[in-house]
From Swiss-Prot:
Mono-ADP-ribosylates eukaryotic muscle and non-muscle actin on 'Arg-177'. ADP-ribosylation prevents the polymerization of G-actin to F-actin, causing actin filament depolymerization, destruction of the cytoskeleton and cytotoxicity. Does not possess NAD(+)-glycohydrolase activity, unlike most mART enzymes. This is Mono(ADP-ribosyl)transferase SpvB. Belongs to the SpvB family. The keyword Repeat does not apply. It is an enzyme of class 2 (transferase). The lineage of its organism: Bacteria, Pseudomonadati, Pseudomonadota, Gammaproteobacteria, Enterobacterales. The keyword NAD applies. It is found in: Secreted. It comes from Salmonella choleraesuis (strain SC-B67). It catalyses: L-arginyl-[protein] + NAD(+) = N(omega)-(ADP-D-ribosyl)-L-arginyl-[protein] + nicotinamide + H(+). Its EC number is 2.4.2.31. Pfam families: ADPrib_exo_Tox (PF03496), SpvB (PF03534). PROSITE patterns: TR_MART.
Length: 591
């Protein structure tokens, strides 16, 4: 994405190896430039090791942009340099590579002339010939190869980047991924990454939206502007179901591919109510921000009217999940908006379990750290407020489980497919493993110790006098027909092999509501301050909890409305109660 934060063009998006940002947030102290920075990860699902490396980055020296002042989410790009003034859009211009380094043409030799004319790439033939010029960074550090392709018939231009790890990146292949002068389409200022492919045939496809006049008051100082230059990152699709060696964009401007994962950047086209999961398809036109602004770095106006309101992670496994587009996580962005300057004031995450259990929002942006003690040894804040509390390894394990380890651990315990690489990284980062290539026995033992620590941390929490808890499940899926049968047979004893998350506060709406009765001495514990998602008052039970099914009340039966009225439902209950198909009354067995 175009960085619009007031930096020079030499600080454009940096190319980074494909990897997922680590969980949580990283707040750094001021460096030699005196700037403070923070990084917030996006809700990106792992996919065989090849997933988009994107995150929200803040710098105290940044300007305004689609994420408010100081914030940016940069994708790979190549741009014309503006260090010597406005580009001339001819051979005299300098190009800046993805790492901000000036690019120079490689030498032309008899064995390797530069430029050359190409009619094909591998087995793919083109309807026109291209003049291909090879470039390299003036100061070599990344050891990638760059090619600038210009069509000899229509003049369309794009870049190919051959990375040292064998990954091929395509930048600006279509007009949607080029930042150009609306009055002169050949005056391209930036080429944005549009597709990447690995040697194994794994693809990532980036989609962009062009600025327009939707929801903008076109009177006054907005009258007569051509605002179509700006490009906003809209979707990142990856996890192609069928491997393909060649770039999809060689043959199609909009690849018709079965993608398994989609990261959606929403600019107000969908609702932002935390209680209502947004749909995959946009419902409305995007919203206009209160503080529109323009950039003129490249000799034409780049007008911005949008703010990214949320980032959504969807999975596409219709056979396994029972629906074409399944929301699994979202990052809600909240702004302090005014006509002068917009600031990001909160970022809240919502996670959606595979069984339909929704985790409540949590504020990801934390208060600033305390100031350092003054020279005299006194602090301007009471020391007790910032005291460091020593925690046992078991409580630390439980806290990490609550924040982001729950999905991997529970899939492992249930015997489901789980991201093994992510599990190893978790064990390594928390000192349960000493190598990232453990033997099967070492990995199994480390997981056993880690799970035992979580369970011990849970059992160390105080008992409660709660007698009823709730859990919402999504069981009306073809893949879960056997599970549904188990849960709808009176007298059955269900053994949950994983940690079981419930709430004594509210029943989160789904097709099945578990109304669970507790007896004195049960092993469930309220996580309280240990919980990462504190808004949901979570009671967690250890693995192998036994539940006996006592009765089932189906929708449409005589007692359904009466029992439904007695349940404490989530805040969006009035809109969603028609989704409830059954209430299952269960009892936790203590032995």
């Amino acid at each position: 994405m175009l960085i619009l934060n007031g930096f020079s063009s030499a600080t454009l998006a940096l190319i980074t190896p494909p990897s997922l940002p680590k969980g949580g947030k990283a707040l750094s102290q001021s460096g030699p430039d005196g700037l403070a920075s923070i990084t917030l990860p996006l809700p990106i699902s792992a996919e065989r090791g090849f997933a988009p490396a994107l995150a929200l980055h803040y710098s105290s020296g940044g300007g305004n942009g689609p994420f408010g002042v100081g914030w940016s989410c940069a994708t790979m790009s190549i741009a014309r340099s503006t260090s010597h003034g406005v580009p001339q859009y001819n051979d005299s211009d300098e190009f800046l590579g993805p790492d901000g380094e000036v690019l120079v043409q490689t030498l032309s030799t008899g064995d390797a002339p530069n430029p050359v004319t190409c009619f094909a790439y591998g087995d793919v033939s083109f309807p026109q010939s291209y003049t291909v010029t090879r470039y390299q960074p003036r100061t070599e550090s990344s050891f990638y190869r760059l090619e600038y392709w210009v069509g000899n018939s229509n003049g369309d231009d794009f870049w190919l980047l051959h990375d040292s790890n064998g990954i091929l990146h395509l930048l600006g292949k279509t007009a949607a991924a080029r930042l150009s002068d609306p009055q002169a389409a050949s005056h391209t200022a930036q080429w944005l990454v549009e597709e990447s492919v690995t040697p194994a045939g794994e693809h990532i496809y980036y989609s962009y939206l062009a600025e327009n006049g939707d929801n903008v008051d076109l009177n006054g100082n907005e009258a007569g502007r051509d605002r179509s230059a700006m490009r906003y990152l809209s979707k990142v699709q990856y996890g192609n179901a069928t491997p393909a060696a060649d770039l999809y964009l060689w043959t199609s401007a909009t690849p018709a591919v079965q993608w398994l994962f989609t990261l959606v950047f929403d600019y107000g086209e969908r609702g932002v109510d935390p209680q209502v999961p947004p749909a995959f398809t946009a419902q409305n036109s995007w919203l206009a921000r209160q503080d529109p602004f323009s950039l003129y770095n490249y000799g034409f106006e780049i007008r911005l009217h949008r703010l990214c309101r949320q980032v959504l992670m969807f999975h596409h496994f219709p056979d396994e999940l029972g629906e074409a587009d399944t929301l699994v996580s979202r990052l809600l962005l909240e702004y302090d908006e005014n006509p002068i300057l917009t600031q990001l004031c909160a970022a809240r995450t919502l996670a959606y379990e595979g069984d339909g259990y929704r985790r409540a929002p949590v504020n990801n942006i934390m208060p600033p750290p305390p100031p350092p003690p003054m020279m005299g040894g006194n602090s301007s804040r009471p020391k007790s407020k910032w005291a460091i509390v020593e925690e046992s390894k078991q409580i630390q394990a439980l806290r990490y489980y609550s924040a982001q380890g729950y999905s991997v651990i529970n899939k492992y315990l249930r015997g489901d497919d789980y991201p093994e690489t992510q599990a190893k990284e978790t064990l390594l980062s928390r000192d349960y493993l000493s190598t990232n290539e453990p033997s099967d026995e070492e990995f199994k033992n480390a997981m056993s110790v880690y799970i035992n620590d979580i369970a011990e941390g849970l059992s160390s929490l105080p008992e409660t006098d709660h007698r009823v808890v709730y859990r919402g499940l999504k069981l009306d899926k073809p893949a879960l027909s056997d599970v549904l049968k188990e849960y709808t047979t009176i007298g059955n004893i269900i053994i949950d092999k994983a940690f079981m998350s419930t709430s004594p506060d509210k029943a989160w709406i789904n097709d099945t509501i578990l109304n669970i009765y507790l007896e004195k001495g049960h092993k469930g514990r309220i996580l309280g301050d240990v919980a990462h998602f504190k808004g949901e008052a979570e009671m967690l039970f250890p693995p192998n909890t036994k539940l006996k099914i006592e009765s089932i009340v189906n929708c449409g039966s005589q007692d359904f409305a009466s029992q439904l009225s007695k349940l404490r439902l989530s805040d969006d209950a009035t809109a969603d109660t028609n989704r409830i198909k059954r209430i299952i009354n269960m009892r936790v067995l203590n032995s």
